[in-house]
């Protein structure tokens, strides 16, 4: 599997680019929103890639960030969705907006993508909601130390519930590819909106909405 290509940019078109790496020229299809990040011919480029293998063809798809690739691979797991539609979605909706659309059942947001109708959008939400929740929270919960968990009587050990949830939120945002600076600024900005009893999903929605308004 080819997961990363770094080399010299040879050619750029509205649909794909050609990268020379290791003496070979790779034709790589890219989403629309990557066009501005693609360097001019002759300059070096580093792309995260996905290799689609079919009986009649092998096709490379490239992305300027690991987060875009993660969303592309996630969408490819949806029944009836192929690489062309997955690429169109990544090129139309930024990863943060996509996660919000799935978590908040925003069918109309997904139907903005060429090739995705109402039924396809509903299927994407139905099949991916739990996976998106898992992606945005799994790493956070794995990182919680034993001293941050509750004992058998429900007493908190060594850290407040609020502090614990903020740590979990930071870890979840980090797993989505955001920088420490972006995470700290976002968490500081939403602290005034946090109320007692909010779960991780609600906190994550607040944070993603804040990041999406930048």
Swiss-Prot record:
Q: Heme as a keyword?
A: no
> What are the record's GO terms for cellular component?
cytoplasm; Holliday junction helicase complex; Holliday junction resolvase complex
Query: Region Domain I: what ranges?
Result: 1-64
In this chain, the stretch annotated as Flexible linker covers 144-160
InterPro entries attached to this UniProt entry: DNA_helicase_Holl-junc_RuvA_I (IPR013849), Hlx-hairpin-Hlx_DNA-bd_motif (IPR003583), NA-bd_OB-fold (IPR012340), RuvA (IPR000085), RuvA_2-like (IPR010994), RuvA_C (IPR011114), RuvA_C_sf (IPR036267)
**Keywords in UniProt for this one?**
Cytoplasm, DNA damage, DNA recombination, DNA repair, DNA-binding
Annotated region Domain III: the residues are: 161-214
Where does the record say this protein resides?
A: Cytoplasm
Question: Could you state one GO biological process linked to this protein?
Answer: DNA repair
One Gene Ontology term of the molecular function aspect = four-way junction helicase activity
Q: Does the keyword DNA-binding apply?
A: yes
Report the principal subcellular site.
Answer: cytoplasm
Q: Where is this region: Domain II?
A: 65-143
Q: What is known of its domains?
A: Has three domains with a flexible linker between the domains II and III and assumes an 'L' shape. Domain III is highly mobile and contacts RuvB.
What HAMAP family does this protein's entry cite? DNA_HJ_migration_RuvA (MF_00031)
Assembly and partners are described as: Homotetramer. Forms an RuvA(8)-RuvB(12)-Holliday junction (HJ) complex. HJ DNA is sandwiched between 2 RuvA tetramers; dsDNA enters through RuvA and exits via RuvB. An RuvB hexamer assembles on each DNA strand where it exits the tetramer. Each RuvB hexamer is contacted by two RuvA subunits (via domain III) on 2 adjacent RuvB subunits; this complex drives branch migration. In the full resolvosome a probable DNA-RuvA(4)-RuvB(12)-RuvC(2) complex forms which resolves the HJ.
Main function: The RuvA-RuvB-RuvC complex processes Holliday junction (HJ) DNA during genetic recombination and DNA repair, while the RuvA-RuvB complex plays an important role in the rescue of blocked DNA replication forks via replication fork reversal (RFR). RuvA specifically binds to HJ cruciform DNA, conferring on it an open structure. The RuvB hexamer acts as an ATP-dependent pump, pulling dsDNA into and through the RuvAB complex. HJ branch migration allows RuvC to scan DNA until it finds its consensus sequence, where it cleaves and resolves the cruciform DNA.
Say which family it is in: Belongs to the RuvA family.
Question: NCBIfam families of this UniProt entry?
Answer: ruvA
Protein name as annotated: Holliday junction branch migration complex subunit RuvA
Query: Gene name, please?
Result: ruvA
């Amino acid at each position: 599997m080819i997961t990363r290509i770094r080399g010299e940019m040879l050619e750029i078109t509205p649909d794909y680019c050609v990268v020379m790496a290791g003496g070979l020229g790779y034709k790589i299809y890219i989403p629309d929103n990557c066009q501005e990040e693609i360097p001019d011919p002759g300059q070096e480029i580093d792309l995260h890639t996905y290799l689609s293998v079919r009986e009649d063809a092998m096709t490379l798809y490239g992305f300027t960030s690991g987060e875009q690739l993660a969303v592309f691979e996630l969408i490819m797991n949806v029944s009836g969705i192929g690489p062309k539609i997955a690429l169109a979605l990544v090129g139309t909706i930024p990863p943060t907006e996509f996660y919000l659309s799935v978590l908040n059942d925003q069918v109309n947001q997904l139907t903005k993508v060429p090739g995705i109708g109402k039924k396809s959008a509903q299927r994407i939400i139905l099949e991916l909601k739990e996976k998106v929740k898992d992606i945005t929270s799994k790493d956070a919960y794995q990182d919680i130390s034993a001293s941050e968990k509750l004992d058998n009587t429900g007493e908190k050990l060594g850290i407040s519930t609020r502090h614990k949830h903020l740590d979990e939120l930071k870890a979840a945002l980090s797993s989505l590819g955001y920088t420490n600076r972006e995470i700290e600024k976002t968490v500081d900005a939403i602290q005034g909106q946090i109320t007692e009893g909010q779960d991780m999903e609600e906190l994550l929605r607040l944070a993603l909405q804040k990041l999406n308004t930048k």
